[in-house]
Amino acid sequence: MATLFIADLHLCVEEPAITAGFLRFLAGEARKADALYILGDLFEAWIGDDDPNPLHHQMAAAIKAVSDSGVPCYFIHGNRDFLLGKRFARESGMTLLPEEKVLELYGRRVLIMHGDTLCTDDAGYQAFRAKVHKPWLQTLFLALPLFVRKRIAARMRANSKEANSSKSLAIMDVNQNAVVNAMEKHQVQWLIHGHTHRPAVHELIANQQPAFRVVLGAWHTEGSMVKVTADDVELIHFPF
């Protein structure tokens, strides 16, 4: 058996091929797993659990079917869907996890997260993140009419795209000191995350021992997952 990790699907109605690929994944590979962990940015945007978007209901039902089949499903918020709440989690059968979680997997201690908190060189993004994660601001935003939230979200996405276009790739990647600090804080030799869309397995030193950082890929033209078994940790790409 295996535990599966995915992230950065950025599901939206404009990308039906990705949605179809995810549905096939849920109906196939996911049903064979010990557990499924979604490490953020499942959706391109999330403006509240009360959004009647049919795609959201379709995904909730599909994930719930996996959960009902006996495969526990877990979710860590990403920078695109950090407002995903308890209502959607309940409808989809997912358990919401904190932004950093340590798992005991087949004899390994593994730290999982979305990964945006590791990009500490991007000071502008970190300041924005700190602001939008304030509970009072989230409560205020979610109290706004849905059409207002949609306009605000569209403007924020446009601003983010414009800001990122002028940033270097290095700034938007993880900071190595932040990686080591996180792994040493949790006393782990394995870290799995997404966010950067740069799939790879990196070797480093943490806790004065060899350590590994496994980065999930985004679902653009193919799927990406990390498969953890008793024997191996594999980064796998597969066609939709």
UniProtKB/Swiss-Prot annotation:
GO terms for molecular function: manganese ion binding; UDP-2,3-diacylglucosamine hydrolase activity. Gene3D superfamilies: 3.60.21.10. Substrate binds at N79, R80, D122, S160, N164, K167, H195. Mn(2+) 1 binds at D8, H10, D41, H197. It is found in: Cell inner membrane. Its EC number is 3.6.1.54. This is UDP-2,3-diacylglucosamine hydrolase. It comes from Escherichia coli O127:H6 (strain E2348/69 / EPEC). The lineage of its organism: Bacteria, Pseudomonadati, Pseudomonadota, Gammaproteobacteria, Enterobacterales.
